[in-house]
Amino acid sequence: VTKCLIDKISGLYAGDELTFRDKLASGIDNKSRMDTLEVFGDRVAGDAQADPKHHGGPDRVLHHFPREHYGHYRRMGLITAGQDAPAMGENISSVGLTEADIHIGDILSFGEVELQVTQPRSPCFKLNHQYGQRDFALAMQQTGMSGWFYRVLKPGIISCQDALILKQRRTDISVAEAMKLYFRPEFDAAAYDRLLSCEGLAASWVGSLQRRLERGSIEDWQMRLYGPDSLALN
């Protein structure tokens, strides 16, 4: 299966300065437009991560966010007219490719680089502070308009002129379906088993799904969605 998903992306972004908002370190709104990105096995050259445990590492080297989602979030009243790519902290912006079109485990070629889709973005409370909206992370979780992460199978250079090509499809679970299965509020062992069968799924998601099955319950999402009480927005 070789299929051109996008013949030209909208933008590539990276930034190495961390900014502070509400006393929180973040690399989310420091990204600048780049003509090319140099991609390594565990990082993008010139791209900083304030919280590598949750937003970096080998399973989350590149974040791809569909640009059309900005319009949806504007219509929901969650972001302003001036907020556009790369305000979600994305490295790759495109139009015409969404979470429904990409599957967990997909292997893609992009310029010199070979990538594998590992997980949807797990929305966290830093988004609430980024946009001054108490429930932004929850809205992203519920709508599924989160974008997705790639691991790097073959490093190299990518350019804005490069096409994104699907080389192999390894699973039948789209990023959109993975969001629904993972963030369903009711415990669902069958759904977790299905996700765990996905080749290429990020190790952090594998671990959390296995813990759910061992405990027979879902972890508390309050801290991820809203942060500590001292930082919660009213």
Question: Where are these predicted regions, by residue range?
Answer:
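Electropositive, beta-rich accessory/interaction domains or terminal extensions
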Residues: 1-129, 135, 170-234
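Active-site glycine-rich loop that binds ribose-phosphate moieties when present
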Residues: 131-138, 142-152
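Short hydrophobic beta/alpha edge segments that flank linear recognition/processing sites
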Residues: 163-167
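A short pocket-lining beta-strand/turn micro-motif at the edge of beta-sheets
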Residues: 35, 146-148, 160-162
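Loop/turn positions that initiate beta-strands
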Residues: 105, 155, 159-162
